[in-house]
């Protein structure tokens, strides 16, 4: 496990763990922030309750500040039937969405070489153009990019080829955050981490991150990097939503302990928390779930309806929409550095950007927690029987 140096101790005051909640103290020496209220790894700078004010949070244990709401380019391109269901955004529409994001304070744009066979990266690069230097770009490698035996995974060979191809498509000389889009059990971890460390030393990557790792995958990767003094993962891109809370069982405590920030993908539960799905009503014809439901997380209808009912009630109390309430709940969760928004049009994007600049009350958060709780699997149900010595993060 990573130890804390004396220098770090002088900068960051202690935090204590009461019965089942983490209580975090203010960081000394932090300028421009009224409070530190999410986690020790989240730098929360908000300007009151101004709905147009973006928050900027530290990305894990790094010094990089990312907007609390970021933009995901998986809707760009529509390269195959799966991605067409997500969106078919072209360069012109992408430019409008990006301008809206930048005007709203968004500084992080996420893509992957596997999105629409690289077309997403191409469109993002063209749409950003000269604005690229004003923002951060995150991309990923792991999924197949060709038919060859080495056109996939995270081997040294594939990562080198994949990174160079991504840089070319994006029209940039470096990637700000480079994710391993999945864990490659066939490649030694030291080979992966050594390759990523070299990319950072070469200036082609600034920060590295994981995505969709199990707890032991992430911890072993961090341990290998620490052993050799290599650059370590500062973030983990994860699926997390009101109807998908498994992240809280193992990965969230790991993120707290190791200062690994969460970049949340599909924060609206694979399209289920858009407000269009209601109890007793058929699935809307325009829903992408008709084509993608079998590839995403599964859940019982009654569970989903209970969560939507709770969201609907709180939306009525706050004057917000169901997606805005669902996103605001996530913004208050431990370890969350940024929520990646996906949108096919400006109306969707504007609505989602309205999740910032206000907060649900503790009572409203508790109501959503209750409606969305699920029975944990082993060993987590056993651990929760005695939280005194192993407190829960939420």
Language-model features: where?
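Short, basic, low-complexity termini and linkers enriched in Ser/Thr/Gly/Pro
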Residues: 1, 10-42, 46
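N-terminal binding-site loop/beta-alpha segment at the start of enzyme catalytic domains
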Residues: 39-135, 201
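Terminal-tail/helix-coil boundary detector
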Residues: 45-54, 95, 257, 281-317, ...
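Conserved, mostly hydrophobic/aromatic
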Residues: 59, 71, 94, 109, ...
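Short, well-ordered coil/turn segments that N-cap beta-strands
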Residues: 66-69, 105-107, 132-135, 172-176, ...
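Active-site beta-loop-alpha junctions enriched in small/polar residues
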Residues: 74, 112-114, 140-144, 180-183, ...
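Glycine/proline-rich, positively charged
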Residues: 80, 146-250
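Aromatic-lined glycan-binding groove of carbohydrate-active enzymes
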Residues: 247-286, 321
């Amino acid at each position: 496990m990573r130890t804390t140096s004396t220098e770090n101790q002088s900068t960051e005051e202690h935090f204590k763990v009461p019965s089942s909640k983490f209580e975090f103290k203010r960081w000394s020496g932090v300028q421009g922030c009224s409070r530190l209220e999410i986690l020790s790894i989240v730098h929360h700078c908000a300007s009151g309750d101004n709905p147009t004010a973006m928050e900027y949070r530290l990305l894990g244990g790094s010094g990089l500040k990312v907007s609390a709401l970021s933009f995901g380019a998986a809707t760009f391109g529509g390269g195959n039937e799966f991605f067409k269901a997500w969106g078919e955004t072209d360069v012109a529409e992408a430019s409008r969405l990006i301008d809206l994001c930048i005007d709203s304070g968004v500084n992080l744009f996420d893509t992957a070489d596997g999105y629409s066979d690289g077309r997403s990266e191409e469109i993002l690069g063209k749409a950003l153009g000269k604005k690229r230097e004003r923002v951060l770009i995150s991309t990923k490698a792991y999924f197949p990019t060709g038919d060859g035996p080495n056109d996939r995974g995270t081997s040294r060979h594939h990562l080198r080829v994949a990174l160079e191809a991504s840089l070319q498509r994006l029209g940039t000389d470096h990637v700000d955050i480079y994710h391993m889009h999945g864990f490659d059990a066939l490649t030694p971890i030291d080979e992966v981490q050594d390759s990523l460390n070299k990319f950072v030393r070469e200036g082609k990557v600034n920060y590295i991150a994981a995505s969709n790792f199990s707890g032991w995958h992430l911890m072993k990767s961090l341990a290998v990097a620490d052993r050799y003094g290599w650059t370590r993962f500062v973030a983990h891109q994860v699926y997390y939503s009101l109807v998908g809370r498994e992240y809280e069982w193992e990965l969230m405590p790991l993120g707290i302990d190791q200062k690994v920030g969460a970049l949340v993908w599909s924060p609206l539960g694979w399209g289920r928390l858009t407000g269009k799905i209601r109890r007793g009503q058929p699935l809307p014809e325009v829903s992408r779930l008709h084509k993608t439901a079998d590839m995403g997380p599964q859940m019982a209808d009654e569970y989903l309806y209970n969560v939507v009912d709770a969201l609907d009630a709180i939306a009525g109390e706050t004057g917000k929409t169901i997606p805005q309430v669902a996103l605001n709940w996530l913004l208050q969760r431990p370890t969350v550095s940024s929520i990646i928004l996906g949108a096919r049009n400006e109306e969707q994007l504007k609505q989602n950007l309205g999740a910032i600049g206000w907060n649900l009350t503790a009572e409203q958060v508790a109501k959503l927690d209750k409606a969305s709780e699920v029975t944990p699997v082993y060993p987590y149900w056993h651990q929760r029987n005695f939280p005194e010595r192993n407190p829960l993060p939420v």
